[in-house]
A protein has these predicted regions:
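N-terminal Rossmann NAD(P)H-binding glycine-rich loop of SDR-like oxidoreductase domains
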Residues: 2-26
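Rossmann-fold scaffold of SDR-type NAD(P)-dependent oxidoreductases
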Residues: 11, 56-61, 102-103
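Glycine/Thr-rich phosphate-binding loops of Rossmann-like dinucleotide-binding domains
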Residues: 18, 68-69, 110-111
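Short, well-ordered alpha-helices that flank and scaffold nucleotide-derived cofactor binding pockets
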Residues: 19, 23-27, 48-51, 91-95
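Adenosine-cofactor binding site in Rossmann-like domains, unifying the SAM/SAH pocket
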Residues: 26-49
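NAD(P)H-binding glycine-rich loop region in Rossmannoid oxidoreductase-like domains
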Residues: 43-81
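Conserved internal alpha-helix in NAD(P)-dependent oxidoreductase domains
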Residues: 76, 80-87, 95
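Conserved Rossmann-fold NAD(P)-dependent oxidoreductase catalytic core, especially the SDR/UDP-sugar
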Residues: 87-117
Length: 117
């Protein structure tokens, strides 16, 4: 599949970091699909969207911003989006030869509880 070097798909465009990227002027065509256009839990949907858009890069920002809070009450949402969704994006990018850039922020884990620093 021939990819467009000036096109970048960005997941999580409505989040804190993604919303900042929307304001940056640059030479790239940035696409910010919402969860209805790019359903990270549906491999076929991801493939269809990425084959249609043919981005050279995918910047993966989507995820629950406070998973520890949500994890306590809704473990399935935390696992679906942060683990399965990310795995699906990774798998399809690898299959289609799309370069994946993955970010995670400090809002994911507060650094005050458990045995990490």
């Amino acid at each position: 599949m021939s990819l467009y070097k000036n096109k970048i798909v960005i997941t999580g465009g409505s989040g804190r970091f993604g919303s900042k990227l929307k304001k940056i002027k640059n030479k790239y065509k940035l696409l910010f699909p919402n969860k209805h256009k790019l359903n990270m839990l549906n491999l076929e949907n991801i493939k269809k969207y990425l084959k249609l858009q043919k981005p050279y890069y995918l910047i993966h920002l989507a995820g629950l911003s406070r998973p520890m809070e949500i994890h306590e009450k809704h473990i399935d949402r935390s696992i679906d989006l942060n683990i399965i969704g990310t795995a699906n994006i990774t798998k399809v990018c690898a299959e289609l030869g799309i370069k994946l850039i993955y970010f995670s922020t400090s809002y994911v884990y507060p650094g005050t509880k458990c045995n990490y620093k």
